[in-house]
C-alpha cells in the first residue's frame, strides 16, 4: 500500500505546533549537532548558513559532485573551511561522527538520498518536495515508514514552523473564521531566463529546475509550498483536481511557465492554485487566502492578515526569515531527544502537486486514486 493514512499525515502536520522556545539556543559547543551537507548549491548554502549561525550545529562535511560548489560553500560559511569534502554521498553517510544530514539536491534525487540517510540512521533535514514523480514519492514514503523512530525527520516546508502561520492555522482550526468555504494559493514569481551552460552533458543537471523529469515541473518544485498550506489548513488532501497550463514564453527545458488548478477536498471544499513565471524577476506575489463565513484570512511568509468583516483588519508581521524558525526547531528537537517524522505530510503535499500536474496533462478531472495508481 502506497497511500498515506490519516494518522501518518496528521502526525506530520502537528510538527509545527507546540514550537520549542527560542531561549533553548544556549547549548555547549561540545554538544553541538554535527551536520553533513549533501548538495551545496544555492539552496543548500542558504540552509547551511542558518545551521552554522545557530551555534548549536557544526557543519563537518560537504558533499557535491561539482567541486566549485563546495568551494563556494566554504566561502559563504567560513566555519566549513576544514569540513571534509566528498563527491559520493554514500561516503559521507558512512561517517559515524555525523549526527544529521542537510539534503538539498535536485528533486529527482530526494528519494534516493533520503532512503540512504534513513538506512544510515541520521537525523534528516531535507529540502522539499518529496520527489518528482509518483514512483519517487512512493519510494521515499516506504523509506520513511522504515525510519528509526529515534531520528528526527523534517522537510523544507518551512512555513509550518513560522509562529505567524501557526497562529493563522489556529484561527481556521478553532472556527474563528467560521465555516471554511474556499481556499486559494498564488505563486506568481518571475525569474531571469535560463541560458544553457557551455559544458554539456553537465548542463542539463546544473539546470535541473527547468526539466520535468528532474524537478517535477514548477507546480511540484515550487508550488508545493502553497499546496502544503492548503492541505494543512483543510486537514485533508484533495480528492480530485482539474486544471490547465502551458508554455508561452519559456524556450528552455520542458516545464510549464503558467498554470491554474482547482482541487476538490472532502465536503466540497475547493482549493485553487494560480501560478506563473511570466513576470519580471523582481515581481513576487506568493500567498494564500482562506474564505470563511466570518471573514477572510491571508497568509504570507512575511505576515498574516485577518479581515473579520467589521472593525480594523488585523495584520501581524513575521519577526524574521521563517527558515530560521524551521532550522531552530529542528535542532531543538534533535537536542531534546523529541524526534518527529514529517515525511508523511510532506509526501501528501507532494502527491497533491503531482495530482495537479497530471490533471493538466490529462486535460480532464483526475482523482487522487488515479494519481496513486499511475
Stretches found by the model and what they are:
Residues 1-15:
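N-terminal secretory signal peptides and thylakoid transit peptides that target proteins
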Residues 12-78, 230:
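N-terminal Rossmann-like dinucleotide-binding module
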Residues 251, 255, 264-325:
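NAD(P)-dinucleotide binding in Rossmann-like oxidoreductases
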Residues 106-107, 111-161, 175, 363:
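Beta-strand-loop-alpha-helix segment that lines the small-molecule cofactor/substrate pocket
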Residues 101-102:
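N-terminal Rossmann-like NAD(P) cofactor-binding module of classical short-chain dehydrogenase/reductase
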Residues 58-59, 312-316, 333-349:
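Glycine- and charged-residue-rich phosphate/anionic-cofactor binding loop of Rossmann-like
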Residues 39, 146-154, 158-253, 261-263, ...:
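Predominantly a Rossmann-like dinucleotide-binding segment in NAD(P)-dependent oxidoreductases
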Residues 83-88:
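Conserved SAM-binding strand-loop segment of SAM-dependent methyltransferases
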